[in-house]
Swiss-Prot record:
This protein's UniProt keywords: Cytokine, Cytoplasm, Inflammatory response, Lysosome, Mitogen, Pyrogen, Secreted
Organism (species): Cavia porcellus
Protein name (Swiss-Prot/TrEMBL): Interleukin-1 beta
Lineage of the species this protein comes from: Eukaryota, Metazoa, Chordata, Craniata, Vertebrata
Protein's cellular compartments: Cytoplasm, Cytosol; Secreted; Lysosome; Secreted, Extracellular exosome
Complexes and interactors: Monomer. In its precursor form, weakly interacts with full-length MEFV; the mature cytokine does not interact at all. Interacts with integrins ITGAV:ITGBV and ITGA5:ITGB1; integrin-binding is required for IL1B signaling. Interacts with cargo receptor TMED10; the interaction is direct and is required for the secretion of IL1B mature form. Interacts with HSP90AB1; the interaction facilitates cargo translocation into the ERGIC. Interacts with HSP90B1; the interaction facilitates cargo translocation into the ERGIC.
Length: 266
């Protein structure tokens, strides 16, 4: 057992040489208090000490006196008048922590959320009412349709992806519903071109699409334009002529860049 240090002057004020306890010589299993010539002292509320005038080891006597003194001191402490809450620490936080902006320059695809990318199914036709149809495995053309031919028009799955946003501009990706094909913009022979690109259906669409797949959907009154995010000022366009391929134009000449968008049920 560790030795009990000598009591300080502050503690000895609560110490009395009369505060002695007695143990039987048979050992601790038969420990009891001896009340020969005993006095009953009430030191404080909840603390009562029975004193015996028997000879006993001084160190143990000091230990008992120390316990009594600590109890008396504890009762002299003023009780807390309010419950300690998280708000009590708030004024200290600025001295402990320093706010720094979180800047994320890169994105790790492995840590992206597996939440489905928001999307809408829609059809497009230009302001001359030409519809977009899939004429070859990887080519869109614009032509007038009517009656039963309307079911030839392609249905787009328009996904809302990461990119620059404003009041009238929304970054989207345009995939063909039911097919692993997406419109993309690439450079060929020194000129931006529009193409249908085949993708892995298990990986696409995703929230952060490669920039060649992203179009800025710009709303103007009742029409929309689709500007390439990869090549600013280049738009999905149709020709004035019938049955011509959909292409990427820079709004020069007679190219049509204004479309009507119609939402369709899933």
């Amino acid at each position: 057992m560790a030795a009990v240090p000598e009591l300080s002057s502050e503690v000895t004020a609560y110490h009395s040489d009369e505060n002695e306890l007695f143990f039987e010589v048979d050992g601790p299993n038969k420990m009891q208090y001896c009340f020969q010539d005993r006095d009953l002292c009430s030191l404080d509320e909840g603390i009562k000490l029975q004193i015996s005038h028997q000879h006993f080891n001084k160190s143990f006597r000091q230990t008992v006196s120390l316990i009594v003194a600590v109890e008396k001191l504890r009762k002299k402490l003023a009780p807390c008048t309010w419950a300690f809450q998280d708000d009590d620490l708030r004024p200290l936080l600025p001295f402990i922590f320093e706010e720094e902006p979180i800047v994320c320059d890169t994105w790790d695809e492995e840590y992206e959320s597996d939440t489905p990318v928001p999307s809408r199914n829609c059809t497009l036709h230009d302001i001359q009412h030409k519809r977009l149809v899939l004429s070859d495995p990887c080519e869109l053309k614009a032509l007038h349709l009517n009656g039963d031919n309307l079911n030839r028009q392609v249905v787009f799955s328009m996904s809302f992806v990461q990119g620059e946003r404003s009041d009238n501009k929304m970054p989207v990706a345009l995939g063909l519903k039911g097919k692993n094909l997406y419109l993309s913009c690439v450079m060929k022979d020194g000129k931006p071109v529009l193409q249908l690109e085949s993708v892995d259906g298990k990986q696409y669409p995703k929230k952060k699409m490669e920039k060649r797949f992203v179009f800025n959907k710009i709303t103007s009154k009742s029409t929309v334009e689709f500007e390439s995010a990869q090549f600013p000022n280049w738009y999905i366009s149709t020709s004035q002529a019938e049955h011509k391929p959909v292409f990427l134009g820079n709004n020069n000449g007679q190219d049509i860049i204004d479309f009507k968008l119609e939402l369709v049920s899933s």
